UniProtKB/Swiss-Prot annotation:
Signal peptide start-end: none
Single GO biological process annotation from the record: skeletal muscle cell differentiation
Location of the protein in the cell: Nucleus
DNA-binding positions: 112-208
Recorded superkingdom: Eukaryota
Listed SMART domains: FH
Source taxonomy: Eukaryota, Metazoa, Chordata, Craniata, Vertebrata
Molecular function as annotated in GO: cis-regulatory region sequence-specific DNA binding; DNA-binding transcription factor activity; DNA-binding transcription factor activity, RNA polymerase II-specific; sequence-specific double-stranded DNA binding
Keyword Kinase attached: no
Listed name of the protein: Forkhead box protein N2
Alphabetic keyword roster: DNA-binding, Nucleus, Transcription, Transcription regulation
Annotated stretches, region: Disordered: 364-387
Summary of the function given for this chain in its UniProt record: Binds to the purine-rich region in HTLV-I LTR.
């Protein structure tokens, strides 16, 4: 479309584009803010007569006082404030705030309680001695403490039943067969969702109708809340104490293992059991175990032979000597010989301690002797013990290296014997 030419000023004012252009031109000419605001008003008021401008209210009073609510009074005529807490049937009976209860003479007995149905059920169950009620007793408790429901429509009972069956905060408890308490099942509060109900009860105001009854006073409700808080705090304290005890026991055990000496009954135990019969002359049976075991009762593991020490040794020694776990005794036993006899060929490596060895009565049965260390506690200082442990560790490592080399030599010899025997058998079969 081309530009509109030949239009009258009245018609230009009726069109929106012309109205905007005219308003902007007037604002540009005037320059001041109040005049610009007046000029930016719709042209429909300017087209009318001057009497229409006189009927408009002057807005200068807005700048005189910033508090616009001083002349207004908030009374009971205002709309009720809807609480943000809703339950499953909250649309039928909304919960209101304290603005509805400023006239207790008029609305004391007939006013709606500020609690949702879930909170009403919770208060009824908590008020009972057994903390569980059937549906009929919940109805009667609500009617006794909130007279509003006596004249209310009967739909509130359906709301109570729906909350009991659909709300996760409540759970059904079956009646015991031995007791005859009537028909139906009992309802109680789920302990998992109990803190949520307590928190919702804190946010709700106390109504004047409920405060008239002594059993449902604000003091009673606050006492119920405090009791539940104390229970929750006790449970949390018990959990925290148990966790701290576990942490402390683990830390103390670590400290005891590193700093405190071992008791007298603890012993160094090594596995020294070997096979005493071989079906093949080249078979070698080796059973290895950890070098140290700090087990008090030697019956816990039947593969370990108990050997007690009379002296207390630091756990640091056991941790360092655990490096010598390769220190084991290896024995090579031929086919036509018994363990411990004169014809047996074997290599023995024992722990070198700073005491004399005693005769082992189990030496003929294939067990290597493990002497008991007899060290006087008073005559030796800590430095001597450290030096002795270092020397023993070095000797144990040397013996372990020698035993490993000896074992490697035995295995190579056995491998060569087996290979030659196989080749001879193959040659005989070919012939």
């Amino acid at each position: 479309m081309g530009p509109v030419i030949g239009m009258t000023p009245d018609k230009r004012a009726e069109t929106p584009g012309a109205e905007k252009i005219a308003g902007l031109s007037q604002i540009y000419k005037m320059g001041s803010l109040p005049e610009a605001v007046d000029a930016a008003r719709p042209k429909a008021t300017l087209v009318d007569s001057e009497s229409a401008d006189d009927e408009l209210t002057n807005l200068n009073w807005l700048h005189e006082s910033t508090n616009l609510l001083t002349n207004f009074s908030l009374g009971s005529e205002g709309l009720p404030i809807v609480s943000p807490l809703y339950d499953i049937e909250g649309d039928d009976v909304p919960s209101f705030g304290p603005a509805c209860y400023q006239n207790p003479e008029k609305k004391s007995a007939t006013s709606k309680p500020p609690y949702s149905f879930s909170l009403l059920i919770y208060m009824a169950i908590e008020h009972s001695p057994n903390k569980c009620l059937p549906v009929k007793e919940i109805y009667s408790w609500i009617l006794d403490h909130f007279p509003y429901f006596a004249t209310a429509p009967t739909g509130w009972k359906n709301s109570v039943r729906h909350n009991l069956s659909l709300n996760k905060c409540f759970q059904k408890v079956e009646r015991s067969h031995g007791k005859v308490n009537g028909k139906g099942s009992l309802w109680c509060v789920d302990p998992e969702y109990k803190p949520n109900l307590i928190q919702a009860l804190k946010k709700q105001p106390f109504s004047s109708a409920s405060s008239q009854n002594g059993s449902l006073s604000p003091h009673y409700l606050s006492s119920v809340i405090k009791q539940n808080q104390v229970r929750n705090l006790k449970e949390s304290d018990i959990d925290a104490a148990a966790a701290m005890m576990l942490l402390n026991t683990s830390i103390e055990q670590g400290i005891l293992e590193c700093e405190k000496p071992l008791p007298l009954k603890t012993a160094l135990q090594k596995k020294r059991s070997y096979g005493n019969a071989f079906h093949h002359p080249s078979a070698v049976r080796l059973q290895e175990s950890d070098s140290l075991a700090t087990s008090i009762d030697p019956k816990e593991d039947h593969n370990y032979s108990a050997s007690s020490m009379a002296a207390q040794r630091c756990a640091s020694r056991s941790s360092v000597s655990s490096l010598s776990s390769v220190d084991e005794v290896y024995e090579f036993i031929p086919k036509n010989s018994h363990v411990g006899s004169d014809g047996s060929e074997g290599f023995h490596s024992e722990e070198d301690t700073d005491v004399d060895y005693e005769d082992d009565p189990l030496g003929d049965s294939g067990y290597a002797s493990q002497p008991c260390a007899k060290i006087s506690e008073k005559g030796q200082s800590g430095k001597k013990m450290r030096k002795q442990t270092c020397q023993e560790i070095d000797e144990e490592l040397k013996e372990a290296a020698g035993s490993l080399l000896h074992l490697a030599g035995i295995r190579t010899c056995l491998g060569s014997l087996i290979s030659t025997a196989k080749t001879q058998n193959q040659k005989q079969r070919k012939k």
